[in-house]
């Protein structure tokens, strides 16, 4: 098993993209401890860590997707006001990495692991949310459906509880999975683990990746999965608070989407949306 912390990072020269924003060098991996406060994940795969200001990527160069992305979400950051740019661009710190054209004509969305809505609190951070090393191929009916609902729910929990969260978002993939573009693996599942940093409560969800995605309504509890099972399925080992309390199956923190929208509009303007 290889510890992400010990893997070698790759630095890139400053590069200006066609979207007229300048890519910054990745930070030292140790700087991303804020996004992995309980410890870095451990994987048997050959993983390259990429530390950004707002998130940590465990990038799998062989699959050209992130194995997992970790980040912290605070109440103020959950109400960011930077408009979405859709500035998808290759990560210049990765040689031979994924590019937007790998997804062209495939029917798959360029699906964020660390979502733009959680990273809209700073202009440069919002741009960095669109680096292709933060993307996986996702069916639009999942990416824009119940997956998006979970992303919005996490922001609601942060704002309404006035508490910070540590979030792990990852791909479930392996031999035999579909490949698009020039070697980009399409995961057969995705997961999200959320830790409340104040209460040490933990909850996990896992989603099979099928297209079109069935309409199962807005009940996220149908996708709850014990974190031990997620780790076994995804072949990744995470660290958790020593006194962590996993929420019972079928239980989640309540969220008021109307109140979240009102809070966003109060901060960002009348046309702002929570999602």
Identify what each model region corresponds to:
Residues 49-110:
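Short, His- and charge-rich active-site/binding loops that engage polyanionic ligands
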Residues 92-275:
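Domain-level detector of nuclease and nuclease-like folds
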Residues 15-17:
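N-terminal signal peptide c-region/cleavage motif recognized by signal peptidases
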Residues 1-4:
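Positively charged n-region of N-terminal signal peptides that target proteins for export
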Residues 20-64:
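N-terminal module-boundary/linker segments of secreted carbohydrate-active enzymes
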Residues 6-11:
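Sec-dependent N-terminal signal peptides
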């Amino acid at each position: 098993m290889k510890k992400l912390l010990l893997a070698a990072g790759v630095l890139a020269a400053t590069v200006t993209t066609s979207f007229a924003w300048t890519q910054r060098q990745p930070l030292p991996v140790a700087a991303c401890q804020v996004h992995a406060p309980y410890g870095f994940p451990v994987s048997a795969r050959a993983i390259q860590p990429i530390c950004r200001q707002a998130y940590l990527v465990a990038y799998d160069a062989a699959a050209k997707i992130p194995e997992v992305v970790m980040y912290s979400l605070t109440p103020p950051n959950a109400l960011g006001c930077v408009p979405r740019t859709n500035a998808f661009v290759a990560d210049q710190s990765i040689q031979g990495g994924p590019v937007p054209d790998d997804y062209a004509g495939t029917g798959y969305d360029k699906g964020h692991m660390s979502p733009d809505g959680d990273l809209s609190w700073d202009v440069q951070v919002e741009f960095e949310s669109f680096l292709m090393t933060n993307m996986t191929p996702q069916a639009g009916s999942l990416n824009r459906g119940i997956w998006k609902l979970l992303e919005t729910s996490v922001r609601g929990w942060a704002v309404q509880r006035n508490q910070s969260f540590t979030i792990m978002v990852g791909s479930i993939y392996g031999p035999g999975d579909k490949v698009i573009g020039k070697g980009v693996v399409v995961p057969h599942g995705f997961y999200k683990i959320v830790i409340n940093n104040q209460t040490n409560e933990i909850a996990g969800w896992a989603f099979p990746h099928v297209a079109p995605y069935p309409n199962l309504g807005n009940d996220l509890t149908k996708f709850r999965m014990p974190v031990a099972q997620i780790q076994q399925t995804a072949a990744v080992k995470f660290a958790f608070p020593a006194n962590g309390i996993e929420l019972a199956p079928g239980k989640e923190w309540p969220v008021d989407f109307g109140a979240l929208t009102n809070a966003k509009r109060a901060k960002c303007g009348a046309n702002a949306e929570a999602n």
